């Protein structure tokens, strides 16, 4: 039996820990409380083929289309073909998906050709999944270290052999035969985000400092509809799937003139259209209009969104709800194979922090929870396989804790590296990504990680002199005929 350290307690980390604990000693490290993760806030659901009128081939094609020519087909085929088994595993762990009679209830979301989105508690899918998996982990032979932040990966030679963590104000070392990063994204890079406070890119930053290869970092998905109110509460795609429409400040529906699928166009299209409309109307938000829909259906299907609206003096069923794009999901991350292996022996990555190429330039709605389960299952199996010899990596760098004005950093990233970008804005944002060396604390560690991630994102965005998917360059608005991926500063052709 070997020791495996899993970092992160969202869907990918919890599933990896559960399955790995059957054969290994597992230590689960999480920066906050175990239930505190982006998974908990996921509303729309999990996409998988579970009906006779759907097929894996259709799910594959929908995913490839959304990915704008940059998806790894092999990764997409794994995701979609293993999706039904992933759903079955969640059911076995006690996730209570909503039912329509005796059958699973299935919703429709943007860019899906079939109704295949499973949800739980209406719009509380992520919370239901997180609660079930936390219960299962608590009952499994897993050592859980809450409020414990990863400082650096330990790599004295070619391989990663442990983690240094910040716990109760002190740095401790945890030795490991394998480290699995499942730390999610870095939405806190931006002033508008749907991500929780813990999403500061800790795993990716540690991997970059350790010399791991990353890919697709220019592709950050901005969800089209977060409440344009304090807190940035996500308003799920599923509301538009039920028939809600978007209106500008003049009350005009505008998406019909943008894309044949109107409000159900791919996320990058809708987010960009909203951002452009907001610019035209002096920064005022656009509005989501669900007033023509059945109030009882809205209340049952979207209890969390309805409650968030009420908390702000609004009614989802009776009012125009102000919305804005917000940073939501990072398609890029630590480059891995289909079994979670990174370029460093002993280091694995899974979920949002990883990049298998499954999402390409733009993630299909509700594929992220599925990704977390499918690739966690594969990663847990791969822990038993001897890692192949890897090419020597650059020497690892220790973190330099930083004190900085986080709000200024977030505003600069939103303005220069947000929904739309150009070389001037990207270079301007880069000048803000600095801070003063400071004593190690959770805050200065997070700030250093945000700077590390922000610099990597900007370098990748500057390297891609085209517009594709979620990466929109106003100074390079066209999409090149040949698809390529940016890995570090290298451009790598995407096989057809």
What is each of the regions a protein language model found here?
Residues 1-3, 19, 25, 33-34, ...:
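Glycine- and aromatic-enriched mobile tails/lids
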Residues 93-171, 182, 223-227:
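Conserved redox-cofactor binding core of oxidoreductases
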Residues 32-64, 68, 224, 236:
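Conserved N-terminal glycine-rich FAD pyrophosphate-binding loop of Rossmann-like flavoproteins
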Residues 34, 206, 212-321, 373, ...:
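An anion/pyrophosphate-binding glycine-rich loop and adjacent beta-alpha core
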Residues 4-28:
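N-terminal Rossmann-like FAD-binding beta1-loop-alpha1 element of flavoenzymes
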Residues 71-84, 117-135, 145, 193-201, ...:
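Short beta-strand to alpha-helix junction loop
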Residues 176-178, 182-187, 353:
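Glycine-/small-residue-rich beta->alpha transition segments that form the dinucleotide
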Residues 2, 169-178, 343-346:
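Core beta-strand elements of the Rossmann-like FAD/NAD(P) dinucleotide-binding domain
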């Amino acid at each position: 039996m070997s020791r495996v350290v899993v970092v992160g307690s969202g869907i990918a980390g919890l599933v990896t820990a559960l399955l790995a604990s059957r054969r290994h000693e597992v230590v689960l490290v999480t920066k906050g409380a175990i239930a505190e993760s982006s998974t908990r806030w996921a509303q729309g659901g999990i996409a998988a083929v579970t009906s006779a009128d759907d097929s894996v081939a259709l799910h594959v094609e929908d995913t490839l289309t959304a990915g704008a020519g940059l998806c790894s087909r092999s990764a997409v085929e794994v995701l979609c073909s293993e999706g039904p088994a992933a759903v079955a595993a969640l059911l076995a762990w006690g996730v209570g998906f909503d039912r329509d009679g005796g059958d699973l209830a299935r919703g429709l979301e943007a860019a899906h050709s079939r109704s295949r989105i499973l949800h739980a508690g209406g719009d509380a899918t992520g919370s239901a999944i997180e609660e079930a998996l936390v219960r299962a982990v608590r009952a499994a032979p897993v050592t859980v270290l809450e409020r414990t932040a990863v400082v650096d990966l330990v790599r004295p030679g070619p391989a990663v052999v442990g983690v240094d963590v910040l716990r109760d104000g002190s740095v401790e070392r945890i030795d490991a035969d394998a480290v699995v990063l499942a730390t999610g994204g870095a939405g806190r890079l931006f002033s508008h985000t749907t991500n929780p406070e813990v999403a500061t890119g800790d795993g990716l930053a540690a991997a970059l400092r350790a010399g791991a290869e990353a890919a697709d970092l220019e592709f950050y998905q901005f969800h089209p509809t977060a409440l344009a109110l304090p807190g940035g509460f996500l308003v799920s795609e599923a509301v538009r799937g039920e028939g809600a429409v978007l209106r500008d400040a003049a009350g005009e529906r505008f998406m019909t003139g943008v894309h044949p699928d109107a409000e159900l166009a791919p996320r990058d299209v809708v987010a960009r259209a909203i951002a452009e409309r907001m610019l035209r109307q002096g920064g005022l938000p656009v509005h989501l209009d669900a007033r023509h829909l059945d109030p009882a259906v809205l209340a049952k299907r979207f209890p969390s969104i309805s409650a968030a609206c009420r908390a702000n003096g609004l009614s989802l069923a009776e009012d125009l709800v102000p919305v804005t794009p917000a940073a939501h999901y990072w398609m890029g991350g630590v480059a891995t194979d289909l079994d979670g292996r990174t370029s460093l022996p002993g280091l694995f990555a899974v979920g949002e922090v990883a990049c298998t190429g499954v999402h390409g330039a733009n993630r299909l709605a509700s594929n992220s929870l599925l990704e977390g389960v499918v690739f966690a299952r594969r990663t847990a199996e791969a822990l038993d396989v001897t890692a192949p010899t890897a090419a020597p990596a650059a020497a690892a760098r220790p973190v330099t804790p930083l004190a900085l004005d986080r709000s200024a950093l977030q505003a600069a990233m939103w303005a220069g590296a947000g929904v739309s970008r150009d070389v001037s804005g990207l270079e301007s944002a880069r000048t803000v990504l600095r801070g003063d060396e400071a004593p190690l604390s959770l805050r200065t560690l997070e700030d250093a990680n945000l700077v590390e991630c922000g610099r990597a994102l900007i370098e990748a965005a500057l390297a891609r002199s085209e517009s594709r998917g979620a990466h929109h360059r106003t100074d390079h608005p066209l999409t090149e005929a040949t698809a390529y991926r940016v890995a570090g500063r290298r451009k790598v052709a995407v096989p057809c």
